């Protein structure tokens, strides 16, 4: 907007004064007399984190990340952005700060991680894979040819790489390349009744059942307020690739991918390990809660896990996690919700691939590319696995993320 002249130098000066971020009169004069352009000034201040996305309230400015223990469902990290400083609200509440929190356009009091229902995009294809395998519509060795346009329904959806084709794919390679056509076929086959007629509602009921079994279509279980997840109620063919009316918060996505990483063991998520009294005596120990077990054969789970591993090796996220030593399995997803705003992006997965320890979900609204949640998770996991330190993160320059993911 600055570069295109939609915002004047005076708008920029007003912005930084309002936010209290204009460091000196010298900078003020440089902006006024043109010694530094507003565009270069804003870019410099964003890279130094003097001005943050939340301050601008321009897309993308909100997102969330959740990391869980695959073997227990315990939440290891839950981050929402924009956020606020708890210290300013502890004991004595700073009234000016409280007023600002309630009136800021970026809504820092809104918990994006637990309440922002966001379309999942192609991350939903893991659910469709499980449903298709469990109900015997496909098996790990079923190959479907990507005919690009799915003409069994009108209007006909297409594979995102149209006019190109993924060719013959099975569940593993369909996940690797995020082949829409493969999942269109499953969403359609689930809806065929005994007479061979397509009934979308029949398929949607199956998809909803497995979304709930996987922990996606039910609340996560965290001990704070969360929104009710929404599984799509329209068009099973498009729902099968994550479109339709699907809407999930990051904690819902985290429980879902934790279940996949745990080969079907659906743990309720929890933020609490134990409760102690003032003398450090444990008065409550919160044990893992298993809600259900999704029944697939070992070969079927292996096929899904292989597909997720291929995503980060040769698929839609192949160029991104190269700086991470730990082996990653995951799935990318982008989703359009508003024609006038950028797409949402998500990445879900687990690590290490060989023996899952943690699973994770990151969703950034209106950021357009899965490279952004991917980069966020890459750096977070490098820290978790001890490959970089806190100081490394804090001292690193803020640069553009390396875009390597496809939008699908």
Cite the ranges covered by each PLM segment:
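Beta-lactam-recognizing serine transpeptidase/beta-lactamase-like catalytic domain environment
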Residues: 1-42, 46, 53-365, 407-408
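Short, charged, low-complexity patches
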Residues: 253, 369-378
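Short, gly/Ser/Thr-rich active-site loops of penicillin-recognizing serine hydrolases
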Residues: 281-283, 289, 376-408
